[in-house]
UniProtKB/Swiss-Prot annotation:
<comment type="function">
    <text>This protein is involved in the repair of mismatches in DNA. It is possible that it carries out the mismatch recognition step. This protein has a weak ATPase activity.</text>
</comment>
<keyword id="KW-0067">ATP-binding</keyword>
<dbReference type="GO" id="GO:0003684">
    <property type="term" value="F:damaged DNA binding"/>
</dbReference>
<dbReference type="Pfam" id="PF05188">
    <property type="entry name" value="MutS_II"/>
</dbReference>
<feature type="binding site">
    <location>
        <begin position="641"/>
        <end position="648"/>
    </location>
    <ligand>
        <name>ATP</name>
    </ligand>
</feature>
<dbReference type="GO" id="GO:0006298">
    <property type="term" value="P:mismatch repair"/>
</dbReference>
<dbReference type="InterPro" id="IPR036678">
    <property type="entry name" value="MutS_con_dom_sf"/>
</dbReference>
<dbReference type="InterPro" id="IPR017261">
    <property type="entry name" value="DNA_mismatch_repair_MutS/MSH"/>
</dbReference>
<dbReference type="InterPro" id="IPR007860">
    <property type="entry name" value="DNA_mmatch_repair_MutS_con_dom"/>
</dbReference>
<dbReference type="GO" id="GO:0005524">
    <property type="term" value="F:ATP binding"/>
</dbReference>
<dbReference type="InterPro" id="IPR007695">
    <property type="entry name" value="DNA_mismatch_repair_MutS-lik_N"/>
</dbReference>
<dbReference type="Pfam" id="PF05192">
    <property type="entry name" value="MutS_III"/>
</dbReference>
<dbReference type="InterPro" id="IPR000432">
    <property type="entry name" value="DNA_mismatch_repair_MutS_C"/>
</dbReference>
<keyword id="KW-0227">DNA damage</keyword>
<dbReference type="InterPro" id="IPR045076">
    <property type="entry name" value="MutS"/>
</dbReference>
<dbReference type="InterPro" id="IPR005748">
    <property type="entry name" value="DNA_mismatch_repair_MutS"/>
</dbReference>
<dbReference type="InterPro" id="IPR007861">
    <property type="entry name" value="DNA_mismatch_repair_MutS_clamp"/>
</dbReference>
Length: 889
């Protein structure tokens, strides 16, 4: 941020025109924003903003005269096209300051002469975390703004969705912060600028660097936060909003302060923050959330994610609630079973589900409509959404009432049913005021029925029937003056006037006729009536539009008085949509109801992968189901087998089954008994973290470290190929010791896939570990994958067979087989090792080329620069050529 003096010097402020000086004054206070500066019917951008935005939006970069002897860069956006351009700016994480004209040029001239500059002011700052417009925001995804305050080893997170008036505060341990951030996925994060000097804490936000908004330390002070909260909610003491600790108060205050600055005159009215306990929810670490592709694929797409498969919701608010369910599975048995009871109730009443879905899909996005109404940013269609929702709510209630009267319904269903209300008074008010069809009406006028307001009806009559009014007045004056040729005329100089011929002018005797002009052939007059009619005609459209906006504000106020009930109604409709969705997909996909217990049970019969099953079904193929029984004597499954045989799919499908069960949905299996999982961890796949300079192996070890440190006996841990990112020596040692630690220290349920066949002998030492492998058919060196998990251990990796399927050259494959035979002469013997930890492992290494291997063994890949790596490659090449020459000699 530049100082005022530096800013003015940079832009040569004192050489600017008065309007450009006004622009620079406003830009100085909004240096972090792209400034859209309203000039007539356009938003204009200058200097660097013009250059950036013209490239981003494909606009013509023009010039607006000269400034300080140089062309002034400028581009513009038509004001009526703003909403079509804004999304592209917001998607690129730009803040946009909207500067509007507060008066017309005519008003400015009256105020301060012809040189006056029109008053302008930033009325709103649009950011990715504070938007509410439909055109700027994804319909089925929450849009969170977060503020985080860290004290010692606890992070207090306040986060809100302005578009739905949701506000939550939660405390998490620092080591769980990245997992929590991946769950919330905030669009903006407000942090203290002091964190910029703490590299350790700042590393926790590596994936969110573009979303961080730094504020000065005082922004988060407890005393300031108290004042902000008291002013925002108009309360005497912050005790009124709940028992918040000091860091939670600071986080809540930071959010409210940020909103007040960004939204200027249109301030959100968030409810009191809901204090959430972490204990009731399953923790899914960031790696697991990513690798399981819960809400988006690894490439960032919705299609192909788990959510894309299970989302058949019919409303936007239902889609958002399902997104929250999937992001935040429950970890409390009674809460999970309450949800499952509702899902089961609807599953047993599929005709009811069909009837409800037909009704619910007619409900607009009442949640976001209500939020826009509360912040005075409502459009007519938002009020229409409330009206439609009130009407349909009665039909939904009537449909549910039929089954409730029969009894034997889940208690939780009554909690969903009770908020369904059809407020006749509010509905009739909206119905009497709003046009029945708003699809063809503009947002600023033409949406209120004429019959609702006598004054509006008069104005519209004037607009549509002005010629009739003029004709009636002309006939009246002819009768009063006895001049049959009297006319009412109009020109640009005099406006409307009464005209009679010179010879008839003497007949005008009434004083109400005021002389305006005499010409060679006629005399012109005016009257108060005519002037009033002319003024009304000129102002009728403006007055009608203003009156409609007044009526809109009155209707919004009436809705605001019922906002709490309407919010509960929206939640009920969302819940009905989600649970009907669960019943619908469970029936369509042949899912079963899981049994959730408080012990460590885990018995899946004929489990399937929800996503892959749907993808291959489209190809008319069948998914091979598999059992998984992680019970007492086999809490750990050590799974060996070749690549492409289905190990990773099996690992993922069991994690997905757990998640689906704990959100209250049926699962893809014949049966499922699951002891509630408190934390879900996975280490699947290999990827360098180039941004932070971490190699594949370092990423793998960091994630494994987190798993070993945070897992409990109630957790589910999924590990795939631990140790493969380093040498075979180290890899086996690490995988071995991790297995021992999970078995003897954590004692949790675990699926562990590996290519280190030497580990299978651990089954004779670790009593709760069982070996499983993937069934294959190997005939005459022709390999067929059967995708069935069976008890036992793979006797070889079949890696060369897979390489053959991939199309490696025959000469390479033959050489690989030769090397494999040499390696298999000397295997790791686990039974002869120390019981507690691997001391040493003896693996034969081909004797050729010895010098090359020695060079590689001395390398530390994590510390190499690209230039050093290239140099070493040349060195290895030369060494190999030299050794080949020596061999030939």
């Amino acid at each position: 941020m530049l100082t005022k003096e530096d800013f003015r010097n940079k832009y040569q402020y004192h050489q600017a025109t008065p309007m450009l000086q006004q622009y620079l004054d406003i830009k100085f206070t909004h240096q972090c924003c792209i400034l859209l500066f309203r000039v007539g019917d356009f938003y204009e951008l200058f200097f660097d903003d013009a250059i950036v935005v013209s490239k981003l939006l494909g606009l013509i970069l023009a010039k607006k005269g000269k400034h300080a002897g140089q062309d002034l860069p400028m581009c513009g956006i038509p004001y009526h096209a703003l909403e079509s351009y804004l999304p592209r700016l917001v998607e690129q994480e730009h803040k946009v300051a909207l500067c509007e004209q507060l008066e017309s040029p005519e008003e400015a001239k009256k105020r301060n002469g012809y040189k006056a500059v029109v008053k302008r002011e930033v009325v709103r700052i649009i950011t990715s975390g504070t938007i509410t417009e439909e055109s700027l925001i994804k319909a089925n995804v929450p849009n969170y703004l977060a503020a985080i305050v860290i004290h010692k080893d606890i992070a207090s997170i306040g986060y809100c969705d302005v578009s739905t008036a949701e506000f939550i505060v939660i405390d998490v341990a620092i080591h769980n912060l990245t997992s929590e951030l991946s769950r919330i996925n905030p669009k903006e994060i407000i942090l203290s600028e002091s964190l910029q000097h703490n590299s350790g804490l700042l590393a926790l936000f590596d994936n969110y660097k573009q979303k961080i908004v730094y504020q000065v330390e005082s922004y988060f002070s407890f005393n300031k936060a108290q004042r902000v909260i008291q002013n925002y909610y108009e309360i005497i003491t912050i005790d009124s909003i709940g028992s918040l600790n000091s860091t939670q108060v600071s986080a809540v205050g930071a959010i409210l302060e940020y909103l007040s600055i960004m939204q200027k005159h249109s301030k959100s009215k968030l409810p009191f923050p809901q204090i959430v306990s972490y204990e009731n929810f399953m923790l899914i670490d960031a790696s697991a959330r990513k690798n399981l592709e819960l809400t988006s694929t690894l490439s960032g797409n919705f299609k192909g994610s788990l959510l894309s498969i299970i989302d058949a919701t019919v409303t936007n608010q239902g889609g958002r609630l399902l997104h929250k369910f999937l992001s935040t599975p429950l970890a409390e048995v009674n809460l999970i079973n309450s949800r499952l009871q509702i899902t089961d109730f609807f599953y047993q009443n599929l005709q009811l589900v069909e009837n409800l879905r037909q009704l619910v899909k007619l409900v607009p996005d009442i949640e976001r409509a209500l939020s826009r109404i509360l912040i005075a940013k409502a459009l007519p269609k938002d009020l229409e959404s409330i009206k439609i929702s009130l009407k349909i709510a009665l039909s939904i209630k009537k449909e549910l009432n039929k089954v409730l009267e029969e009894g034997n319904t889940p208690k939780y269903l009554e909690e969903i049913y009770n908020p369904l209300f059809g407020d006749n008074e509010l509905y009739e008010l909206l119905d009497s005021a709003l046009l029945d069809d708003l699809s063809n009406s503009a947002n600023d006028c033409g949406f209120i029925k004429s019959s609702y307001s006598t004054k509006l009806e008069e104005l519209r009559n004037l607009i549509h029937n002005s010629s009739n009014f003029i004709e009636q007045l002309k006939l009246q004056y002819r009768q009063e003056t006895c001049i049959e040729t009297l006319k009412i005329c109009h020109n640009n100089v005099w406006g409307m006037f009464i005209e009679v011929s010179s010879k008839n002018a003497h007949k005008i005797t009434d004083s109400k006729f005021v002389h305006k002009q005499t010409t060679t052939t006629a005399v012109r007059f005016t009257t108060t009536e005519l002037q009033t009619l002319e003024a009304k005609m000129l102002n009728a459209k403006t007055m009608a539009a203003a009156l409609e906006q007044e009526i809109l504000a009155e209707l919004c106020k009436a809705i605001s008085l019922k906002s709490e009930k309407l919010s509960h109604l929206a939640k009920s409709i969302s819940l009905i949509d989600v649970f009907c969705n669960f019943a619908y997909i469970s029936h369509e996909y042949n899912y079963c109801r899981p049994e959730i217990t408080s012990d460590l049970a885990f018995n899946i019969v004929d489990g399937r992968h929800a996503v892959i099953e749907k993808l291959i079904t489209k190809k008319h193929e069948s998914f091979i189901s598999n059992d998984c029984n992680l019970q007492n004597d086999q809490r750990i499954w050590l799974i060996t087998g070749p690549n492409m045989a289905g190990k990773s799919t099996f690992l993922r499908q069991n994690a997905i089954i757990v998640i689906l069960a704990q959100i209250g949905c049926y699962v893809p299996a014949q049966s499922a008994q699951i002891g509630v999982v408190d934390k879900l961890f996975s280490r699947i796949g290999a990827a360098d973290d180039l941004a932070s300079g971490q190699s594949t192996f370092m990423v793998e070890m960091v994630e494994t470290s987190v798993i070993l440190a945070q897992s409990t006996f109630m957790s589910l841990v999924i590990l795939d190929e631990i140790g493969r990112g380093t040498s075979t020596y180290d890899g086996i040692s690490i995988a071995w010791s991790c297995l021992e630690y999970i078995h003897s220290n954590i004692r949790c349920r675990c699926l562990f896939a590996t290519h280190y066949h030497e580990l299978v002998d651990l089954a004779s030492k670790l009593l709760s570990l069982k070996n499983f492998t993937v069934k294959i058919h190997d005939s005459n060196d022709k390999l067929s994958f059967l995708y069935k998990i069976i008890e036992g251990a793979a006797n070889k990796s079949y890696g060369i067979h897979v390489a053959e399927l991939a199309g490696l050259p025959r000469i390479v494959l033959n050489r690989a087989k030769e090397i494999l035979l040499e390696l298999e002469h000397n295997k790791v013997n686990i039974n002869q090792s120390n019981n507690n930890i691997t001391k040493s492992i003896d693996i034969a290494v081909p004797p050729y080329p010895v010098k090359t291997i020695e060079i590689i063994k001395q390398l530390n890949p994590d510390q190499l620069t690209p230039k050093e790596a290239l140099s070493i490659i040349y060195k290895i090449k030369n060494t190999i050529l030299l050794e080949e020459d020596e061999k030939m000699i």
